[in-house]
Amino acid sequence: MASLRSAHPADRIIVALDGMAPEQALAFAAQVEGLRWVKVGLELFVQAGPEVVAQLREQGLRVFLDLKFHDIPATMAGACRRAAALGAELITVHACAGSEALKAAQAAAVEGAQGAGQPAPTLLAVTVLTSWEEQRLQRELAITQGIAERVPALAQLSATAGIGGCVCSPLEAAALRAQHPEPFALVTPGIRPKGAAVGDQARVMGPAEAIAAGASQLVIGRPITKAEDPSAAFAACCGELLG
């Protein structure tokens, strides 16, 4: 992914279409003034099918397909090949799948995009989900490595495998940016604009602070999708990035 340092704020905000029926998601995306990027997650993709990507792109939107592929190398490669052919520009994979699967996914994504006449997408490795807290990782998954050590290790594994970026908490963005200069992409959920509730995210930060910490793009959902005036909420988020 090219550097977004001088990009318009709207290019740096990805609105998550989570918890919406397909018709609702398409209508919502069409009504938000200035919107450029949307995130399609598992729930919407399972409901609507692959055609939702094409429908959103027909509305002039760029699509982050957040399906977090995690499987054996051949299966991950096949999934990424198909996802890239749809025209999704960002696609998530789990770093924990390992280097062999990550390399296979990256090669297949390029192949799938080329075969469909689409630009090659950026694969984003998921390190540690922002809903996890360190104590719960230790208690439930027996992972003794702290988040501060685990996230950089998984990001390095992914970068070495040729993955173009990672998804991380904004709290880890500064350390990862120091480790991985642009154009390595850092896409951060867990973004809460001024006055927004934290919700189910355990590791959060404001939009301007996340960009200053090194994030490339921000994923924002409910503070925009549940707002009384989504266009105004989106504009306010863009305004926070402008200072």
UniProtKB/Swiss-Prot annotation:
Residue stretches in coiled coil: none
Catalytic activity of the protein: orotidine 5'-phosphate + H(+) = UMP + CO2
Active-site residues annotated for this sequence: K68 (proton donor)
Pfam families, per the entry: OMPdecase (PF00215)
MF terms in GO: orotidine-5'-phosphate decarboxylase activity
Gene3D superfamilies: Aldolase class I
GO BP of this protein: 'de novo' pyrimidine nucleobase biosynthetic process; 'de novo' UMP biosynthetic process
Key word Lyase present: yes
SMART domains named in the record: OMPdecase
Keywords: Decarboxylase, Lyase, Pyrimidine biosynthesis
Enzyme Commission number(s) from the entry: 4.1.1.23
Binding site for substrate: 18, 39, 66-75, 130, 192, 201, 221-222
Pathway the protein takes part in: Pyrimidine metabolism; UMP biosynthesis via de novo pathway; UMP from orotate: step 2/2
NCBIfam families with a match to the protein in the record: PRK00230.1 (NF001273), pyrF (TIGR01740)
Cross-referenced PANTHER family: OROTIDINE 5'-PHOSPHATE DECARBOXYLASE
Self-association state and partner proteins as the record states: Homodimer.
Function according to Swiss-Prot or TrEMBL: Catalyzes the decarboxylation of orotidine 5'-monophosphate (OMP) to uridine 5'-monophosphate (UMP).
Protein name, UniProt field: Orotidine 5'-phosphate decarboxylase
Species assigned in the record: Synechococcus sp. (strain WH7803)
